[in-house]
Amino acid sequence: MSARAGIVVTGTEVLTGRVQDQNGPWLADRLLELGVELGHITLCGDRPADIEAQLRFLAGQGVDLIITSGGLGPTADDMTVEIVSRFCGRELVLDAAVEARIGEIVKGMMARFPGVDADAVLAANRKQALVPAGAVVLDPVGTAPGVVVAGSPTVVVLPGPPRELQPMWHAAVATDAVQTAIAGRTRYQQQTIRMFGLPESGLADTLRDAEKTVADFDRLEITTCLRRGELEIVTRFEPRDTATYAALEGLLRDRHAREIFSTDGALVDDQIAELLAGRSIATAESCTAGMLAARLTERAGSSAYVAGGVVAYSNAAKTELLGVDAGLIERHGAVSEPVAEAMAAGALQRFGADTAVAITGIAGPGGGTPTKPVGTVCFSVALAGGASVTRATRLPGNRSDIRERSTTVAMHLLRRALTGGG
């Protein structure tokens, strides 16, 4: 049986949703890469009894490794190290070398704040130099060191900020204690297929058939997820089952070739960035109010191909900023394929681009009519030279869902236009 792990994400701000947890999913991926089975991710607040209860729960599940995140700061509610020390039966001791290192970091930070009492800050941060006796101390990235406490289970204590946790994790994995804890791991392979335009029921039908026709199908660990209107199929398997996975992938390709857009885990955003190399794109948005432009510019280096965008929310803005004929809007309505086409053409001209995408729709909750209900969205992708792809669809969900799904639809229409998929 493979080595197993559990993760405890601490922090009342995470528990209550004020801060979104990034550490649990990131650590889950890293464990998967190591071939370690993840049994549980738990969230709890800053109360010591709650944190200790999570540690005892995971230990009772027989995990070999527990990883905690958060609660390593200098304030009174940062008590994770103390709780782990008690859980592991270790005395809490002051590490002079760690104290000196933290002192150097704090003095460097305080040099930028001459009016602050550095000695008072140092006294508060002294708490961070208290570590369980015999623990391996991980050098701080911020001011908080991490610790690794060997045992059954071994416990890795990491800071909460992802920018500190992520580099420290690699140091933790290299320790003898963690290597011993995960010695029984099984090396897995993981493959991801992404689809767009296929309902979950259609994929479910194919997987039911695969269960009957693909030899050793039960040796594949398959998870599916619908996100942003896309289907993600993640399959994990041992190297000896590569042929079984190949048979599954072949069946998916046979049934859903048009809907599959990625078999190597690449996101549509990655593909669009590659397809736009050497091109210039402009956006014209109404109901999404700049969300598509924001998504296109999330990738570093996007300034090489994103010329600009216009948020033309009102009819007047569509006319004044994009040159859409007011009579066209009067005849067809602002949410219509002709207006979407005119918006895309206007963006091409305004920015001197060779590619443009336009979105106009009714995100709700009001504004719908019997002929154009809430969720009606029209898209147009225009390429220099006259080629264009225009679509109208009705998207489900609330206002936020419709706006987010609209950006996804637009990205896929753009992908198909740039690859000649129509």
From Swiss-Prot:
Taxonomy, superkingdom: Bacteria
SMART domains xref list: MoCF_biosynth
Pfam family for this entry, one: CinA
InterPro entries xref list: CinA, CinA-like_C, CinA_C, Competence-induced_CinA, MoaB/Mog-like_dom_sf, MoaB/Mog_dom
NCBIfam families for the chain: cinA_nterm, PncC_domain, PRK00549.1
Sequence similarity: Belongs to the CinA family.
Protein name, entry field: CinA-like protein
Highest classification ranks of the organism: Bacteria, Bacillati, Actinomycetota, Actinomycetes, Mycobacteriales
